[in-house]
């Protein structure tokens, strides 16, 4: 059989569907899995395809590939990736390409890029988003690492990626771990999107006593507006789905949300970088809190909702519109925070990320795909140096016009004792971001009082620090 165009290791859901996607686009693929039975099972299902070869010996797998060899690894992140790379190296030659398509931490990808470059192997850390359906029909693909690999692998991955307006949702991101970092931020934004939708659902449920189906239908309507997105449509579908007995499927799901860790990575990276990514952080914490099901059940008995809570008088239609405005405004703020982190890390690592291009890559094939991303692209095109999306004309006007409804929706939630960590965090960030003179002068004054850390003065140039003799003369001296 003729040599294959690409090899793929790891026949879990994503790997299998990527293989089938590649074959559909005319590429011959060799596959390998550490568990031979998975390879054999996959071949039984699809072995009639002349573009597919399966191997149970890694050396034979490597030798089946065209040179330079292109091998995509789709296995669990962490040590398993390093172990797989080590097992491949004895059979590789200079110029061969290794592609890690899993959810690896970007600093691991940086390390692998550097180590493999010394050995003459071209490493690519590739973010792949879209889940099972995206992998099969066209994902959003975020490749980064060794730029020398891109001309060789671009024809494959730009062919299998989602297409929007005739453009592939796949373009080169940057060196080192740039691809995996962008994918992680994508996942963090996804966490925020999902949590905001959940909180909006709870406001409508608690204040208007609407059913799952009624709220699902509202979400279907909102999906025809500026809130149009994969997640809004999926949320509507989940809320309205009924089983064969007519029971709402969502009513049977335990309110304990899992996570794979990428959201936590982004939260930690934001804190290390000094970027106030409050929504993504709150969305991660909300999932941790959800895991305390038994504790929450007990606390619900111990702390019943007070009967004299604030209840603003309002027509249902007005509250529904306020909730929609709050969701859209918070979504803008969440994405603004995500792009702030992308910009900050890009500058620190000299990646020169094209933020407008990233918005285009995410328009199709991925979990956060939405019409909203076109607005982000246009914003960066017209105002590339703006500190935040919030300062770009379109988003600025939306925030100004929706502020009243946003605040009313928050009041409804607080008045009903509804936990809205992300919506509340979004409003707090908005208010803090536009506060010229904040009370944090007191923080720095206290730091100087008990720790002699010094402070900058309003009437002096930035960068000059002073210390006050708080317990003595109260006079300040330059440090």
Curated annotation (Swiss-Prot):
KW Membrane (keyword) present: no
Alphabetical list of Pfam families matching this protein: 6PGD, NAD_binding_2
Source species, domain of life: Bacteria
Entry annotated with the keyword Cytoplasm: no
EC id: 1.1.1.44
Single GO MF annotation: phosphogluconate dehydrogenase (decarboxylating) activity
Enzyme class of the recorded protein, top EC level: oxidoreductase
Residues engaged in binding substrate: 103, 129-131, 186-187, 191, 260, 287, 447, 453
Catalytic activities: 6-phospho-D-gluconate + NADP(+) = D-ribulose 5-phosphate + CO2 + NADPH
Pathway in which the depicted protein is active: Carbohydrate degradation; pentose phosphate pathway; D-ribulose 5-phosphate from D-glucose 6-phosphate (oxidative stage): step 3/3
Keywords from the UniProt entry: Gluconate utilization, NADP, Oxidoreductase, Pentose shunt
Active site: 183 (proton acceptor), 190 (proton donor)
Residues binding NADP(+): 10-15, 33-35, 75-77, 103
Single biological process term from Gene Ontology: D-gluconate metabolic process
InterPro entries, sorted: 6-PGluconate_DH-like_C_sf (IPR008927), 6PGD_dom2 (IPR013328), 6PGDH_C (IPR006114), 6PGDH_Gnd/GntZ (IPR006113), 6PGDH_NADP-bd (IPR006115), 6PGdom_BS (IPR006184), NAD(P)-bd_dom_sf (IPR036291), Pgluconate_DH (IPR006183)
Alphabetical list of SUPFAM superfamilies matching this protein: 6-phosphogluconate dehydrogenase C-terminal domain-like, NAD(P)-binding Rossmann-fold domains
Subunit structure: Homodimer.
Biological function: Catalyzes the oxidative decarboxylation of 6-phosphogluconate to ribulose 5-phosphate and CO(2), with concomitant reduction of NADP to NADPH.
Family that this chain belongs to: Belongs to the 6-phosphogluconate dehydrogenase family.
Protein name in the entry: 6-phosphogluconate dehydrogenase, decarboxylating
Organism: Chlamydia muridarum (strain MoPn / Nigg)
Lineage of producing organism: Bacteria, Pseudomonadati, Chlamydiota, Chlamydiia, Chlamydiales
């Amino acid at each position: 059989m003729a040599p294959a165009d690409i090899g793929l290791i790891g026949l879990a859901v994503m790997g299998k569907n990527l293989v089938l996607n590649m074959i559909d686009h005319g590429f011959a693929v060799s596959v390998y899995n550490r568990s031979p039975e998975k390879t054999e099972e996959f071949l039984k299902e699809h072995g009639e395809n002349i573009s597919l070869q399966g191997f149970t010996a890694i050396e034979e797998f490597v030798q089946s590939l065209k040179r330079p060899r292109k091998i995509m690894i789709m296995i669990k992140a962490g040590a398993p990736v390093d172990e797989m790379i080590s097992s491949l190296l004895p059979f590789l030659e200079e110029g061969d390409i290794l592609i890690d398509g899993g959810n690896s931490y970007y600093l691991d990808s940086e390390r692998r890029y550097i180590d493999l470059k010394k050995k003459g192997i071209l490493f690519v850390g590739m973010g792949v988003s879209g889940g099972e359906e995206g992998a099969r029909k066209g994902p959003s693909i975020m490749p980064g690492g060794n730029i020398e690999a891109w001309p060789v692998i671009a024809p494959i991955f730009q062919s299998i990626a989602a297409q929007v307006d005739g453009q592939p949702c796949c373009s080169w991101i940057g060196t080192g771990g740039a691809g995996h970092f962008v994918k992680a931020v994508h996942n963090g934004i996804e966490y925020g999107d999902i949590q905001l939708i959940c909180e909006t659902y709870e406001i409508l449920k608690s204040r208007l006593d609407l059913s799952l189906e009624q709220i699902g239908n509202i979400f279907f309507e909102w999906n025809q507006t500026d809130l149009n997105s994969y997640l809004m449509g999926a949320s509507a579908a989940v809320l309205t789905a009924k089983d064969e007995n007519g029971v709402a499927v969502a009513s049977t799901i335990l309110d304990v949300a899992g996570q794979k860790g990428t959201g936590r990575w982004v939260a930690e990276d934001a804190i290390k970088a000094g970027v106030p990514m409050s929504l993504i952080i709150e969305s991660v914490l909300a999932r941790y809190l959800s895991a305390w099901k038994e504790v929450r059940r007990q606390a619900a008995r111990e702390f019943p909702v007070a009967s004299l809570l604030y209840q603003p008088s309002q027509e249902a239609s007005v509250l529904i519109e306020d909730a929609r405005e709050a969701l859209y405004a918070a979504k803008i703020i969440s994405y603004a925070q995500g792009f702030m982190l992308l910009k900050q890390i890009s500058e620190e690592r000299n990646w020169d990320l094209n933020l407008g291009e990233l918005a285009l890559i995410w328009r199709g094939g991925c979990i956060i795909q939405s019409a909203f991303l076109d607005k982000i692209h246009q914003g960066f095109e017209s105002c590339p140096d703006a500190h935040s999306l919030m300062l770009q004309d379109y988003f600025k006007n939306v925030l100004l016009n929706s502020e009243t409804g946003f605040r009313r929706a928050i009041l409804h939630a607080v008045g009903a004792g509804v936990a809205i960590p992300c919506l509340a965090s979004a409003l707090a960030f908005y208010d803090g971001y536009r506060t010229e003179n904040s009370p944090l002068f007191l923080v720095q004054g206290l730091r100087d009082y008990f720790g002699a850390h010094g402070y900058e003065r309003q009437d002096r140039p930035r960068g000059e620090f002073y210390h006050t003799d708080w317990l003595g003369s109260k006079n300040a001296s330059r440090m």
